[in-house]
Amino acid sequence: CYKKLSMSKKNSSVILKNGFKDFPDLNKIYLNFKNKIIQTRIKSFIVAISGGPDSLALAALTKALKSEKKYNFQYVLINHNIRKNSSFEAKQVKKLLKVNNINLKVLHNKIKIKNNLQSHARNLRYDLLVKYCLKKNTKSILTAHNLEDQVETFLIRLSRGSGLTGLSAMKFETKLNSKIKL
């Protein structure tokens, strides 16, 4: 469900607390999300949280679904320790989710990233998430992306000279290894 939403952290916080009743358009997105999750036939997920509005909306979606069905969602934030405020920001996100009865596990990247920051950070993030999945015996990771993320992925691939097969945007499901799906 890559519908463009005007979602601020404030709106995400309201949704976490009250559900979707104050945002009628989000009910359609929730039902679409719920159907996609049901179709996977998977009951346990790691939910990757960044603290941005997309991932807070995902936290709200999973919290609502958990209250309705028997799913196990474990919430994880990767702190890359890149910025001075990274630890403070991670604590703030953890606090926000805790107030909304969501437990957040913060994993810390200890490898210093020297170049190609975005790509290396993404690879390290997925490595940490895969290790956490294996530790928790969970085979699926949920991440939040919006339409702008899809367009950005397409444009990055285009700028790198990708051929027709590489010009797709993000897939709904990607295998990270033989056991773990994103």
Label for each model-derived stretch:
Residues 1-6:
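Short, Lys/Arg-enriched N-terminal segments with co-localized hydrophobic residues
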